[in-house]
């Protein structure tokens, strides 16, 4: 197995890790219940997508 010949510097390590940060999901507003939801997905609060009820939500 190959091993590193030299130690990587802190700058080189942090430069490589600069793109590893998690991005916040872009949320949109549900037109039916006005709760935040992920675009192009069923609303977890009311169960609607594109004006149709796709998932039946159980009331607690």
Swiss-Prot record:
GO MF, one example: structural constituent of ribosome
Pfam families membership: Ribosomal_L32p (PF01783)
Any single biological process term in GO: translation
Entry's family note: Belongs to the bacterial ribosomal protein bL32 family.
GO cellular component, one term: large ribosomal subunit
Gene that this polypeptide is encoded by: rpmF
Keyword terms: Ribonucleoprotein, Ribosomal protein
SUPFAM superfamilies: Zn-binding ribosomal proteins
Compositionally biased spans, kind Basic residues: 1-16
PANTHER family per the UniProt record, alphabetical: 50S RIBOSOMAL PROTEIN L32 (PTHR35534), LARGE RIBOSOMAL SUBUNIT PROTEIN BL32 (PTHR35534:SF1)
Alphabetized HAMAP family for the sequence: Ribosomal_bL32
Protein name per its UniProtKB record: Large ribosomal subunit protein bL32
InterPro entries, alphabetized: Ribosomal_bL32, Ribosomal_bL32_bact, Ribosomal_zn-bd
UniProt region (Disordered), positions on chain: 1-28
